[in-house]
Amino acid sequence: MKNKIAIIGAGVGGLTLANLLGKDPNFELMIYEREETLRLDEGFGVQLAVNSVSILNEIGFDKINQTEIFNPQRLEFYSNDKRICGLDLTQFNIDSEKYTTLKRSALLKFLKDKLFSNIFRFNKSLEKVETINDKIKIKFTDGIEDEVDYLVVSDGVFSKTKSLIEGKDYSPIYIGSKAFRITMPKDKVKIFDSNNINISMKPNAHLVIYPINQKTCNVVMITRCNTALSKKLEDITFAKSFIKKTFNLSSEFDEYINDDLKHWSLYSSKNPVLPKINNVFYLGDAFYTFLPSMAQGAAQSIEAAKELFEILNNTNKNKSEEYFNQRAERTKLINSRSNFNYFAFHFSNTLFVYFRNLILKRLIKNSKFVDSYLGRVFRK
């Protein structure tokens, strides 16, 4: 008899898991999504290191239209827009497994198109979860019910399902920062390298710009701000003026910082949670939300989906605990680096900035350090 699985949330992690399970005749699955449809028109960019590309290649990612992706070869570091040094990203590549950037919507479309449309149920908000005779019974607000063997919660950073299951509020924590995003044509980028990933560190802020396909660059600006300032930044006119001043942007950015400017507050998780119900699994941001300073959000969702797929196929009866322990250990590694980067990127003291830049130049040339600090993340 097939094992029945319900996936709550059609994000990167949930869709990756669905693709892996779809190849296995031992599973029957259904994806429940609270939105009316998948958002495939958004321009948010994602970065995928080898640890995630190798998994996606198992489901045909190496055959994706090359115009929809980009393979940057270097990571360039700047301090107040003055180049410090660069890192060769190709040292982590293996054959067709290359560091890749693309629109998040392009990744979602790739994952969705490989699945049968009849496994999706939209406009579904979970209302109740309980166990009945070794089965997990789920009930939605519209009255629809289902009984499954496994429940995968993959509904994002603001996961309400986790709080519902655990009977406790697990809302993420505001980290005192706000992000802004624009896109601009690659050929309009002048002071940065439009073919590679650029990180420009500034006082209490940093800017990241990288190509997301053959024609477009994604520009993300992150600044520290308290709650009062965060509220003021909801006003688009004030926000445009603020980021131009904070990031000291050159004139090439002017026409793209307009009323279409996207912005959002940054959140992180407290600690990973072992589900109190066996055969329930938290995936992606529902498991743990990282700071964006390691660019591993999507990659870790994909990696976790692969881990869970393998655990679902083994004979261990305590699968929830096995998955939790494995994922928590990996999360600890990624989180420590993300937090350190976030701290170091935002130095404002002139002396600290000087020594940070000096140390960074030396560390980039140290292959043992690079392999330990980045290799352990980029290659799993």
Regions inferred by a protein language model and the residue ranges of each:
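Conserved N-terminal helical subregion
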Residues: 5, 22, 49-165, 170-183, ...
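Conserved N-terminal glycine-rich FAD pyrophosphate-binding loop of Rossmann-like flavoproteins
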Residues: 37-55
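Glycine-rich FAD pyrophosphate-binding loop
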Residues: 22-42
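Conserved Rossmann-like nucleotide-cofactor binding loop
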Residues: 13, 37, 158
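Acidic/histidine metal-binding catalytic segments
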Residues: 67-68, 119, 244-260, 316-322
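Conserved FAD/dinucleotide-binding core of flavoprotein oxidoreductases
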Residues: 85-99, 103-109, 187-262
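C-terminal auxiliary extensions adjacent to catalytic cores
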Residues: 358-380
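Conserved mid-domain beta->alpha element of the FAD-binding
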Residues: 6-24, 152-153, 180, 236-238, ...
